[in-house]
């Protein structure tokens, strides 16, 4: 039986992760801690012999740099890299740039969690005149419509079809594929891989910088539901930290 591997790696801590701001499509960089997390992720891949033959990432530098740093640490810096906007983080609309704790205090827990974790409730749209808008960003010039806001359902609808068409066939063929992306684009994919309900996906948190490995057979069936973190203890602590965002 042919078995392929799918490695999911959320980018290391970004500048706005550190300052507790909604980031979305704003192209912020990694912090020094984020760079170290990305390196550690690559070292885990090398140490456990999970070596990708290709990497897919977004058009945002925090994911691109995470991929590059991790691949360098794993001695896989030479493999092909595919960048696509459909792996981008969820667009957080008018929340982009806002502090999470201040937003929670202003709008209340229920509205805050609906925007942040519900499956189908997008935040208010971002105006094209905002400094955080991507309306005139050249990397999205070929899109018919540049998103002004998204909910997780929107991310599923843009990313999962791309995954099925472009990435899944390689995994089914026995390749090991690395996806270096974002909290919500990876949540969208895990929802699909593990058949998580629209309600239950609200409870899923993806930690930064810790590889999550799925094994799939040639039919595309997941052989280890839920995946396997290469550092389970660090993953549990990291997921708890993500869940706590907005509380401080």
UniProtKB/Swiss-Prot annotation:
Positions binding substrate in this chain are 10-17, 23-24, 62, 89-92, 100, 116-117, 183-184
Residues in a coiled coil are: none
Q: What is this protein called?
A: 2,3-bisphosphoglycerate-dependent phosphoglycerate mutase
Q: Which PANTHER family match?
A: PHOSPHOGLYCERATE MUTASE (PTHR11931)
Pfam families noted in UniProt: His_Phos_1 (PF00300)
Q: Pathway, according to UniProt? A: Carbohydrate degradation; glycolysis; pyruvate from D-glyceraldehyde 3-phosphate: step 3/5
Which family is this protein grouped under?
Belongs to the phosphoglycerate mutase family. BPG-dependent PGAM subfamily.
User: Which E.C. number(s) belong to this protein?
Assistant: 5.4.2.11
| Reactions listed under catalytic activity | (2R)-2-phosphoglycerate = (2R)-3-phosphoglycerate
Q: By which gene is this protein encoded? A: gpmA
User: Which GO BP terms, alphabetically?
Assistant: gluconeogenesis; glycolytic process
The annotated active site, in chain numbering, is 11, 89
Keywords from UniProt, A to Z, are:
Gluconeogenesis, Glycolysis, Isomerase
The record's PROSITE patterns line, in alphabetical order, gives: PG_MUTASE (PS00175)
The organism's superkingdom is given as: Bacteria
Q: Site annotated as Transition state stabilizer: where?
A: 182
Gene Ontology MF annotations: phosphoglycerate mutase activity
What task does this protein carry out? Answer: Catalyzes the interconversion of 2-phosphoglycerate and 3-phosphoglycerate.
């Amino acid at each position: 039986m042919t078995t392929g591997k799918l490695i999911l790696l959320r980018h290391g801590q970004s500048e706005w992760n550190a300052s507790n701001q909604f980031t979305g499509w704003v192209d912020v960089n990694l912090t020094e801690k984020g760079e170290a997390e990305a390196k550690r992720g690559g070292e885990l891949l090398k140490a456990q012999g999970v070596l990708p033959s290709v990497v897919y990432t977004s058009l945002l530098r925090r994911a691109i740099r995470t991929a590059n740093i991790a691949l360098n640490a794993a001695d896989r810096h030479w493999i092909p890299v595919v960048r696509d906007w459909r792996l981008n983080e969820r667009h957080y609309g008018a929340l982009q740039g806002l502090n999470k704790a201040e937003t929670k205090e202003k709008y209340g827990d229920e509205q805050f969690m609906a925007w942040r974790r519900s499956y189908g409730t997008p935040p208010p749209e971002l105006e094209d005149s905002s400094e955080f808008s991507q309306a005139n960003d050249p990397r999205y010039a070929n899109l018919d419509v540049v998103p002004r806001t998204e909910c997780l359902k929107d991310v599923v609808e843009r990313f999962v079809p791309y995954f099925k068409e472009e990435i899944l066939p390689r995994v089914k063929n026995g390749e090991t594929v690395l996806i270096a992306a974002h909290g919500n684009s990876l949540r969208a994919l895990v929802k699909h891989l593990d058949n998580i309900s629209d309600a239950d996906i609200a409870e899923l948190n993806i930690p930064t910088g810790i590889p999550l490995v799925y094994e799939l057979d040639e039919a595309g069936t997941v052989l280890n539901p839920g995946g396997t973190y290469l550092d389970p203890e660090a993953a549990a602590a990291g997921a708890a930290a993500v869940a706590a965002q907005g509380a401080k």
